[in-house]
A protein has these predicted regions:
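Clamp-loader machinery-focused feature within the broader ASCE/P-loop NTPase space
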Residues: 2-160
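Conserved D-loop-proximal element of ABC-family nucleotide-binding domains
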Residues: 163-164
Length: 164
């Protein structure tokens, strides 16, 4: 997300930008919030700043390019709770739901993990981030960055991590 798309949080946005511009960004950043407070938009803002840089993002915003188009970068990975479609067979992964995920980001940037699960029309099923997904995280992190810069992984709904 562009900085201007995030409601409030001016001090935090400035601190994030300053940290990134000085190259002082930690290898792991944790955004904890209550539903609707902007943790996900701040994480997306931070991710885009790390990958593209301030000047590029500023130019794209001036040109009217949607920030959501910038989320489709090969070095930006998303992990989120998923619903297994059927019993047996292979387990569902985040990649199976990527189209739904980008629709969710576009329509509900301040949504919580339950909003995400509701969008999947899961009925009474619970979304989880399973062992297979954690293994995929490990594999993705060890890949070389596509553009030679930074790689970013946004893990949404981490409270849904499961041992199965």
């Amino acid at each position: 997300m562009y900085r201007s798309e995030i409601v409030g949080q001016e001090k935090l946005k400035s601190q994030l930008r300053k940290m990134i511009s000085k190259g002082q960004s930690p290898h792991c950043q944790l955004f904890i919030d209550s539903k609707g407070y902007g943790g996900l938009p701040l994480a997306l803002f931070s991710a885009l700043e790390l990958i593209y840089g301030f000047e590029f993002l500023n130019n794209e915003e001036q040109k009217g390019v949607s920030s959501h188009k910038l989320l489709y970068h090969p070095d930006l990975h998303f992990i989120y709770p998923v619903i297994n479609k059927s019993s047996g067979g292979s387990k569902a992964t985040s990649e199976d739901y990527s189209e739904n995920w980008f629709v969710f980001l576009n329509n509900h940037p301040y949504g919580g993990s339950q909003d995400w699960i509701n969008q999947l029309e899961a009925g009474n099923k619970q979304g989880i981030i399973g062992v297979e997904e954690v293994s995929r995280i490990h594999n993705k992190i060890h890949l070389k960055a596509h553009s030679g810069g930074k790689k970013v992984m946004v893990i949404f709904g981490v409270e849904k991590l499961s041992e199965s």
